[in-house]
């Protein structure tokens, strides 16, 4: 097993230098278009890899209303995304991709990418963050991410101990969203 940059992984796959690869968007869609067969993904593996918004703790504690307002704006965008057909988002997504990554994004691949990634409404997020009686789903996901990065030596065991329970993933500010 070799840890490589996604572009290098895709090149190795295209050159038949490997038997299996781990890719994420957009590279997984490019590989699929070139004949790759997906053996598993985050869903079939029973895991999650959510978008994580991180706030500076001191700022968030000092200005909880502003922090919640930011989340409210983000969640309005999520709601708009969920209500808009993916086909109507392609051009804007391609523009974003070109700006962010510096590359063009094929229309069909951009559509697959938009359709593949889940986004969660406020109500869904409150459910995912509910830690009543047990670690929340998000805390479990974050714990799995920490364990993965520890296992491939991207973070040390000491660093992993700081985040391995996922308890930093909290619904405190989500509950303040109006």
Regions found by a protein language model. Give the residues of each.
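Helix N-cap / beta->alpha transition motif
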Residues: 41, 56, 121, 165-173
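Conserved C-terminal helix/tail region of periplasmic/extracytoplasmic solute-binding proteins
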Residues: 138-178
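Secondary-structure end/capping motifs
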Residues: 62-155
């Amino acid at each position: 097993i070799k840890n490589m940059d996604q572009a290098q992984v895709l090149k190795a796959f295209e050159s038949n230098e490997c038997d299996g690869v781990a890719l994420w968007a957009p590279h997984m869609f490019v590989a699929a278009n070139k004949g790759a067969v997906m053996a598993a993904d985050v869903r079939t593996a029973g895991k999650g890899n959510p978008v994580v918004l991180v706030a500076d703790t001191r700022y968030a504690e000092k200005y909880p209303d502003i922090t919640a307002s930011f989340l409210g704006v983000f969640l309005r965008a999520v709601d708009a995304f969920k209500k808009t057909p993916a086909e109507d988002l392609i051009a804007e997504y391609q523009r974003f991709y070109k700006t962010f990554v510096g590359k063009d994004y094929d229309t069909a691949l951009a559509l697959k990418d938009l359709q593949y990634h889940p986004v969660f409404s406020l109500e869904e997020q409150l459910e995912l963050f509910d830690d009543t009686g047990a670690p929340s789903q998000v805390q479990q996901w974050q714990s799995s991410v920490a364990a993965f990065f520890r296992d491939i030596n991207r973070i040390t065991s000491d660093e992993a101990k700081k985040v391995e329970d996922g308890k930093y993933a909290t619904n405190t500010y989500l509950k303040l969203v109006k």
